Each structure stands twice: as C-alpha cells, then as structure tokens.
UniProtKB/Swiss-Prot annotation:
Underlying gene: Rxrb
Keyword Metal-binding: yes
Lineage: Eukaryota, Metazoa, Chordata, Craniata, Vertebrata
Subunit structure: Homodimer (in vitro). Heterodimer with other retinoic acid receptor family members. Binds DNA preferentially as a RAR/RXR heterodimer. Interacts with NR1H3. Interacts with AKAP13.
Residue ranges, compositional bias (Gly residues): 307-317
Amino acid composition bias (Low complexity), ranges on this chain: 119-130
Tissue and organ distribution: In all tissues tested, including brain, thymus, spleen and liver.
Natural source organism: Mus musculus (Mouse)
Name of the protein in question: Retinoic acid receptor RXR-beta
GO molecular function terms noted in the UniProt entry: chromatin DNA binding; DNA-binding transcription activator activity, RNA polymerase II-specific; identical protein binding; nuclear receptor activity; nuclear steroid receptor activity; RNA polymerase II cis-regulatory region sequence-specific DNA binding; RNA polymerase II transcription regulatory region sequence-specific DNA binding; sequence-specific DNA binding
Residue ranges of the region described as Modulating: 1-191
Function summary: Receptor for retinoic acid. Retinoic acid receptors bind as heterodimers to their target response elements in response to their ligands, all-trans or 9-cis retinoic acid, and regulate gene expression in various biological processes. The RAR/RXR heterodimers bind to the retinoic acid response elements (RARE).
Compositional bias annotation for Basic and acidic residues: 64-79, 263-275
Length: 520
C-alpha cells in the first residue's frame, strides 16, 4: 500500500505528507492503527489475543491489588509501569508482531476505556438500590463475571483496581433502622412479681400487674378463702395464674403484698365518701325497714289529700277527661315525692344539686311505679293518688289507649301475679332514684355505690322473706326496663299535651317537664 494514498482512517493532512518525514508518518500510522485495532478487538483476532494476554499480565495478586489501588490514588492501572510484568517475559507471544517501538519523547496516549459507561446504573436497575453490586450466590468466592463489568472500577478514594477488589458498601450506615439494643429505654420495664406479666406499678408494696392487684384486693375485701386441688405448689405465671387461686394468693403474700395496705385504702375511700360505718355493700347500710317507712309515710299523706266526692267515684265520676285527671294527680304526687326521697337512706347526704338532678331524671318512672302498684286490686283501670279511677275505655277514648294497655299488662298485671309488697316496691323505686347515668352529677360513682347497696338489700330481703322463690329477685329487676320504656312514652304524651295546650298542667309538673331542656 502506498503511503501517498490516504487510508480511510487518516485525515487528509497525513496523506499529503504534511506531518514531517516518512518515518514519523509511518510511526504515527502504526500507532493509530494499533489503537484502532485495540479499540475494535473483534476486527483483528491477533490483536484481541494480545490484549487479553496483556490484561492478564497486568492483574496483580489479591493482596497487592487493594494495596496498589488504595495506596496510590494517582496511578492509572492502564498505564505502563516498571513494576508491571512484561507479557513477553512470561512467554505470552502475540500472534502478530507489535508495531515499531515508540520514542520516549512521544508516548502514546493511554488506552481509553471501553464504551460501556459506568457499571453502577446497570447494577442499580437490576437490584433496585444504587451503588450496590448484585449479591453473589452462597459459597461463591471468585470474581464477579458479568458482561457489563469487564474493566477496572474507580474506588471511592480515587484509586482503581480490578473488579475483584470492589466491595459492596456496608449496609446500615445511613437510613437503616436497627432494633434498639438490649439496654435501651424499653429494657427497664418491671414485671409482675407474682405472674411475670408487665407491671403497671407498685401495688400494696409489690410491683404487680392489674390482674394480680385486683385479685389480691378482692380477696382481702371480701375475706375469701381458697383451697388447692394439688400439692399447693402450682405454677403461677401469665398463662396459668387463674388456674389455682390458693397458690396465687399465697404467692402474693410471699412476694410481700400487705393486707393492711388494702384495708387502709378502703378506709380512705370511706372517709372520702363520708360513709364510715359498716362494710361497703353490706345490707345494713341500706336497711329495708327505713325504705318501707318512707313508702308508708307518703301513702298516708296521699290518703289525707284525697277529696271526699271523688274518693269512691268510678271512671266517669270526674267531669275532666282521663289525661287531665292523671296530670293533676301527678302534680300533687310530685310534692310527696320530694318527701319520700328525703326519707331514703343516704339520699340527703348527697349534694343538693345532685338531689335535684336525680329527682328530675326519675320522677316519671317513680310516679308510674307508685300508681301501678296502687292499682293491683283494680280491674281494667288504675287508681290515682287523688282517689279517682281511670278505666281502660276512658283512656282509649282520650287517645292514650296504647300506653294505658302497656301499663296494665307489663306493670299492674305482673305486680299482681307475684304479689309484690311495699318493701319490694320501695326498693325498686330507690334503685330508680339512685341513677348514676343522670347527666350533671358531681359524683356518679357515689350514686352507683348507693344503688348497689339497694340491690344487695333487696336480694337479702327476697331470700329471707321468700326462700321458696329462688327467682323472685330477678323477676323484680325485670320490671325496671318496662318502667323505663313506659316512662319515656308517657313523657312524649305529656310534652304533646303541653304543646297543644288542651290539658292544664300545673306549675310543679311544668317545671319538671322543662327541666331536661334547661339542663341539656
């Protein structure tokens, strides 16, 4: 080939001989051709074999690779070095002779890297995490063989090394949420000394959970005794603490729980409530004889207020309609209702505002229970406190037949069948009076305690007075939902009559009807 003819890869000035003597042009020509073959190794198999041999000779030992790459940050692994072994000295002969030797004054430029770009985007796309190489399979210790990673990779310190020296960054340096150490903030939680559950604090001198605290408290307050079915060495832990009460109680005492601490707490509660005589919940605190006295006293006042002409009259003895008669009787009964409440034990000890709230919340149910029990001996009608009888037919003609029938079937008939006495009636009314759900109470808990005392007194009375009737106490309590439902329905009727203005409603009853709206 003539050098006068321009090769396709040389610029025009090389072909025209503008680059100096012929020897220099030949040297440059060989250098460019060599670089061209090295850049395109697949065009020249001999050059590809020589490049592979040179790359193998340049790879340092595993111990020296990291030291050379990290220690000398300014050295390029592709540049010739005096310490690098010569591929010819190791017996690796290229298939084609290399080009003429280059003069020291004009060294060839370093070999450019293959046109692959950075390998990290490829790894990022396959792993979903930037900068992390693909994980090696278990038991694999050799170099990473990937068609994308076939050149040296620059290390973070500025040095370079072969792909075997690239270590994945340590996970958890940034953004990795590690679990707290064993000695962290959550390690100081105390456990229950009895069952090992999580402790809620120190109770009766020992760190314990709420379950063991309540168990010990109930045992002391109710003076309970237990027995063990086994050898009194049962396991008491979080799962089996309810299996043997005897062993659980003995473990409470063994760990240091104090009986006197429960008694002192109980005494402080009684002093706070102003109720220091007797045991909490005992029937003696709500004697049924005083409740009976309250019922009898109110009944005598009602009998004294009955007028002579209407005392024995029938359903049509009064010129007024049944609704008017009921409203007038209710208005008179409200005055005696206050006297009755004052005679109920512990009611007067409540704050005055709470007394008013309780009366306003239950006056309708209290009056319905009273005239329903009074009407036990009346057939198909009710007997009012004024002495007037209201017959079923009169109620239907006045438009209140549905609610009137409910009073007769759900209250009067049931009271008649079980022969409810006045003591039981008084206890039911006391339960209605002590309503802890009334809105605006300053201390609902105290009212609830009083209601529980009435429950206990009524149950004891039923067992002593009617021992053959095991379910009498339950039957009495079943009348309370009926009283509640009928009382709400009667309020709807009274509000309706008040709005239309056809029925005269006296002052006290009017105040009671308006009270819920004022309190709300």
């Amino acid at each position: 080939m003539s050098w006068a003819t321009r090769p396709p890869f040389l610029p025009p000035r090389h072909a025209a001989g503008q680059c100096g003597p012929v020897g220099v042009r030949k040297e440059m020509h060989c250098g460019v051709a060599s670089r061209w073959r090295r850049r395109r190794p697949w065009l020249d198999p001999a050059a590809a074999a020589a490049a592979a041999g040179e790359q193998q000779a340049l790879e340092p030992e595993p111990g020296e690779a990291g030291r050379d790459g990290m220690g000398d940050s300014g050295r390029d692994s592709r540049s010739p070095d005096s310490s690098s072994p010569n591929p010819l000295s190791q017996g690796i002969r290229p298939s084609s002779p290399p080009g003429p030797p280059l003069t020291p004054s004009a060294p060839p430029p370093p070999m450019p890297p293959p046109p692959l770009g950075s390998p990290f985007p490829v790894i990022s796309s396959s792993m979903g995490s930037p900068g992390l190489p693909p994980p090696a399979p278990p038991g694999f210790s050799g170099p990473v063989s990937s068609p994308q990673i076939n050149s040296t990779v620059s290390l973070p310190g500025g040095g370079s090394g072969p792909p075997e020296d690239v270590k994945p960054p340590v996970l958890g340096v940034r953004g990795l949420h590690c679990p707290p150490p064993p000695g962290g903030p959550g390690a100081g939680k105390r456990l229950c000394a009895i069952c090992g559950d999580r402790s809620s604090g120190k109770h009766y001198g020992v760190y314990s959970c709420e379950g063991c605290k309540g168990f010990f408290k109930r045992t002391i307050r109710k003076d309970l005794t237990y027995s063990c079915r086994d050898n009194k060495d049962c396991t008491v832990d979080k799962r089996q603490r309810n299996r043997c009460q005897y062993c659980r109680y003995q473990k409470c005492l063994a760990t240091g729980m104090k009986r006197e601490a429960v008694q002192e707490e109980r005494q402080r509660g009684k002093d706070k409530d102003g109720d220091g005589d007797g045991a909490g919940g005992a029937p003696e605190e709500m004697p049924v004889d005083r409740i009976l006295e309250a019922e009898l006293a109110v009944e005598q006042k009602s009998d004294q207020g009955v007028e002579g002409p209407g005392a024995t009259g029938g359903g049509g003895s009064s010129p007024n309609d049944p609704v008017t008669n009921i409203c007038q009787a209710a208005d008179k009964q409200l005055f005696t209702l206050v006297e009755w409440a004052k005679r109920i034990p512990h009611f007067s000890s409540l704050p005055l505002d709470d007394q008013v709230i309780l009366l306003r919340a239950g006056w309708n149910e209290l009056l319905i229970a009273s005239f329903s029990h009074r009407s036990i001996d009346v057939r198909d009608g009710i007997l009012l406190a004024t002495g007037l009888h209201v017959h079923r037919n009169s109620a239907h003609s006045a438009g209140v037949g549905a609610i009137f029938d409910r009073v007769l079937t759900e209250l009067v008939s049931k009271m008649r069948d079980m022969r409810m006495d006045k003591t039981e009636l008084g206890c039911l009314r006391a339960i209605i009076l002590f309503n802890p759900d009334a809105k605006g109470l300053s201390n609902p808990g105290e009212v609830e305690i009083l209601r529980e005392k009435v429950y206990a007194s009524l149950e004891t009375y039923c067992k002593q007075k009617y021992p053959e009737q095991q379910g009498r106490f339950a039957k009495l309590l079943l009348r309370l939902p009926a009283l509640r439902s009928i009382g709400l329905k009667c309020l709807e009727h009274l509000f309706f009559f008040k709005l239309i203005g056809d029925t005269p409603i006296d002052t006290f009853l009017m105040e009671m009807l308006e009270a819920p709206h004022q309190l709300a």
